[in-house]
């Protein structure tokens, strides 16, 4: 089992360092890129929007999409 390594990700021009297993690094980077994109969509042209509010709304949108995909998958498996 390999130890987590620190990786820097950028969300709305802020840097965050997180620990990740080496074999999951590319997946984490893709997730960070997706989240950054969604946060920018939520923020839109309102550069004064609070980062925490933007993050929560982006996370809620992504969670909603995930739930819809799970519901669709369950419906197909019935």
Q: What are these model-predicted stretches?
A:
Residues 1-2:
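N-terminal intrinsically disordered, cationic/polar leader segments
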